[in-house]
């Protein structure tokens, strides 16, 4: 479109008919009113006719400077105006490329290269705002279609890739009905091509997002704040309707069913994008090697296992199981310097056996004399019964003799040979070997160029501890465990000291037989849950007495436990002589049972018995004082009226009611030095028994503690009576 402007240029210097020279400046003298300001669209070509006198043939331009003299500045935009026709009184100028309006440049002024003065009457061109385009129905439908396709590609990417192949296989196995299995198979068909699936949906979504953005920008052309809206509107629509909503829907419980139901749409998309997506997926597969969604780092596996575990123990087992196949024997073994071993020449005496029991090891390596690196055998603690059958431990055989005795046994269940494994062997392979039952113990050998040596040992427990954690046989959280530990330590200490201290007049085996016989004969003590160690406190050293020949022992309100000597017993039925002798040597259980039967059935009473208990009626008084319904069954033979020492000496324990009461209440406890201290009470057990439905026992009452010794007691053991 041509715009005609009427303007008059008058030369400041020069004659009216002469053309402008280089030294003759141009000055604007006036323009027609109402046409001094015009508007043009950005980059819109236009032309106009300029009237005047002595008009120049070139040198016209438009500039954004407020003065023509400043048009040479770098920050100023200048556009040259071309002279199409030039005459003496007018000229036709054109701007074929239009004026480049932008945010910072919205006004251009017409200037001439020889002009030095600018006035407001000079030609001014303003930017013209384009009219907003009318929305067409086809453009709106096309935008809706683009958003729908982009949303489908974005959501279905998550819908198909949400489950791994492991999850889909599990779902296929547990699915109920053919319809559910059919949906899983449809998902698995595309899930196996996960790389191509990701590339296809990404390409499809990107294409339709670009088409939507371009169409939306055309629809917003010419509106107010056009530049801002062209960026904000497409971005918000794509974010909300093409990303957030479809991904949220496909991530929910509906995503799986949608992906399985719209499988035919996915097939069409695969076919359309196949020429580009398939080669691109091959390139990605070439570099990634494996499924882009199936590869899990060790950290991801650890986090997954932690989320699956319900407690710390399960988490430890799962974490150890994932790394177990990478473990070597050398990482799980016990170094040879920390191993408890026996020398082949070492004797199996009392101290050694008690040390083995105290250590608690089930398998003891045996080395060759002083060289701990040469393992010649293994002593299994469970074979000690077989060892006692073959050898006599009282003779203190050496470890070599014990192993030789085990070797002579024909029973092949005795395994004393040692297996050797390489330090670089995989731990799971060794575990598979040990699970066969051939061996549960092995020596770890490290091989060098010219030599080899034993550097440690490994057991099946060491390997299992790596899987399930440390096997702690002592649970410190349970009170019962601490009680058992104290009891075990007390028994071991008792075994070490018995027979080696002057205050222990009997060997350990004889003491144990006395206590066992006491608990076997006195049933009321069992009702109080009195065990061996508590019975040992009752039969303490300060209660041992010695009677001389022809002495009549006091029987009134006393319980006598005679363990050595010969006595003459008189009861309501008969008078007989009884020999008491606790065997010092090991005897079989058959001999013990025969002696017990002879004690109760032999009328001649000539067979020695290990223990003779006199004064059982005192036990019934004890139970009555404690308020217990339990009592000792008594017969006429239990009421002894007279007891005379026949042998030169007779050793016995003398117990009064107060002694029994104090021991049961825990008021007195005798240590190894004979000192009395506070012990543990057993009345809680009695109270729990008395609260049963069959019990008619009144409320338990605890008598006051009474000193177990009095001034008129007989002379203690090893002292002569007056």
Curated annotation (Swiss-Prot):
Domain CBS: 333-396, 413-473
Chain ranges on the Cytoplasmic side, renumbered to this chain: 161-196, 249-257
One GO CC term on file: plasma membrane
PROSITE patterns with a match to the protein in the record: CBS (PS51371), CNNM (PS51846)
Domain CNNM transmembrane: 132-318
Ranges of the Extracellular topological domain: 18-139, 218-227, 279-722
Region entry Disordered, spans: 584-607, 686-722
Keywords: CBS domain, Cell membrane, Glycoprotein, Ion transport, Membrane, Repeat, Signal, Transmembrane, Transmembrane helix, Transport
Example of a GO biological process term: positive regulation of gonad development
Highest taxon of the lineage: Eukaryota
Job description of the protein: Probable metal transporter. Probably acts redundantly with the other metal transport proteins cnnm-1, cnnm-2, cnnm-3 and cnnm-4 to regulate Mg(2+) homeostasis.
Family: Belongs to the ACDP family.
Listed name of the protein: Metal transporter cnnm-5
Gene name of the encoded protein: cnnm-5
């Amino acid at each position: 479109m041509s715009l005609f402007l009427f303007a008059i240029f008058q030369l400041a210097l020069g004659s009216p008919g002469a053309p402008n020279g280089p030294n003759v400046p141009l000055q604007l003298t006036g323009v027609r009113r109402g046409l001094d300001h015009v508007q043009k669209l950005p980059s819109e070509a236009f032309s106009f006719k300029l009237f005047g006198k002595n008009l120049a043939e070139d040198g016209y331009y438009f500039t954004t400077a407020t003065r023509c003299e400043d048009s040479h500045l770098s920050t100023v935009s200048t556009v040259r105006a071309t002279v199409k026709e030039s005459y003496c009184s007018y000229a036709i100028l054109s701007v074929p490329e239009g004026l480049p309006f932008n945010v910072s440049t919205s006004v251009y002024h017409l200037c001439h290269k020889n002009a030095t003065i600018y006035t407001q009457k000079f030609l001014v061109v303003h930017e013209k705002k384009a009219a907003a385009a009318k929305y067409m129905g086809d453009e709106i439908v096309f935008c809706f279609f683009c958003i729908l396709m982009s949303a489908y590609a974005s959501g279905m990417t998550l819908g198909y890739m949400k489950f791994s192949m492991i999850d889909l296989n599990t779902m296929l196995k547990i699915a109920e009905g053919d319809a559910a299995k059919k949906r899983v198979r449809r998902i698995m068909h595309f899930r196996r091509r996960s790389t191509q699936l990701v590339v296809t949906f990404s390409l499809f979504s990107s294409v339709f997002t670009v088409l939507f953005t371009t169409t939306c920008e055309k629809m917003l052309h010419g509106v107010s704040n056009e530049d801002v809206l062209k960026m904000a509107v497409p971005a918000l629509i794509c974010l909300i309707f093409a990303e957030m909503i479809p991904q949220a829907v496909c991530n929910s419980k509906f995503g799986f069913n949608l992906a399985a139901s719209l499988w035919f749409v996915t097939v069409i998309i695969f076919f359309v994008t196949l020429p580009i997506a398939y080669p691109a997926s091959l390139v990605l597969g070439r570099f990634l090697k494996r499924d882009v969604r199936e590869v899990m780092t060790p950290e991801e596996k650890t986090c997954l296992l932690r989320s699956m575990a319900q407690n710390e123990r399960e988490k430890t087992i799962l974490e150890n199981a994932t790394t177990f196949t990478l473990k070597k024997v050398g990482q799980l073994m016990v170094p040879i310097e920390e191993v408890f071993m026996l020398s082949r020449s070492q004797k199996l005496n009392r101290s050694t056996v008690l040390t083995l029991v105290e250590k608690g090891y089930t398998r003891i390596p045996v080395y060759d004399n002083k060289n701990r690196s040469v393992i010649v055998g293994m002593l299994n603690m469970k074979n000690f019964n077989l060892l006692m059958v073959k050898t006599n431990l009282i003779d203190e055989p050496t470890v070599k003799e014990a192993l030789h005795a085990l070797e002579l046994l024909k029973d092949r269940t005795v395994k004393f040979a040692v297996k050797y494994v390489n330090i670089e062997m995989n731990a799971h392979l060794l575990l598979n070997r040990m699970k066969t039952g051939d061996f549960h113990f092995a020596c770890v050998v490290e091989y060098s160029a010219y030599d080899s040596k034993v550097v440690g040992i490994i057991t099946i427990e060491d390997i299992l501890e790596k899987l399930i954690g440390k096997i702690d046989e002592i649970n410190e959280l349970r009170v019962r465990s601490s009680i058992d530990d104290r009891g075990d330590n007390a028994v071991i200490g008792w075994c070490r000291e018995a027979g080696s201290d002057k205050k222990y007049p009997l060997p350990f085996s004889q003491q144990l037989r006395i206590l066992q016989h006491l608990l076997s004969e006195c049933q009321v003590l069992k009702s109080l849950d009195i065990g061996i160690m508590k019975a040992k406190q009752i039969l303490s050293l300060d209660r041992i007495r010695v009677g001389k020949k022809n002495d009549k022992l006091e029987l009134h309100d006393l319980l006598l436990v005679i363990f050595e000597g010969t006595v003459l017993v008189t009861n309501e039925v008969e008078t007989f002589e009884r020999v008491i002798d606790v065997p010092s040597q090991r005897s079989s259980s058959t001999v013990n049972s025969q002696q017990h039967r002879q004690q109760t059935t032999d009328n001649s009473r000539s067979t020695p018995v290990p223990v003779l208990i006199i004064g059982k009626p005192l036990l019934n008084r004890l139970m009555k004082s404690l308020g217990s319904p339990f009592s000792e069954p008594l017969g006429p033979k239990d009421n002894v009226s007279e007891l005379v020492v026949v042998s030169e000496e007779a050793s016995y324990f003398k117990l009064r009611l107060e002694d029994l009461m104090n021991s049961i209440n825990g008021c007195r406890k005798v240590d190894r030095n004979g000192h009395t201290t506070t012990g543990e009470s057993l009345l809680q057990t009695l109270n729990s028994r008395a609260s049963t439905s069959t019990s008619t026992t009144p409320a338990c009452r605890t008598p006051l503690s009474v000193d177990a010794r009095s001034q008129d007691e007989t002379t203690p053991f090893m002292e002569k009576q007056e």
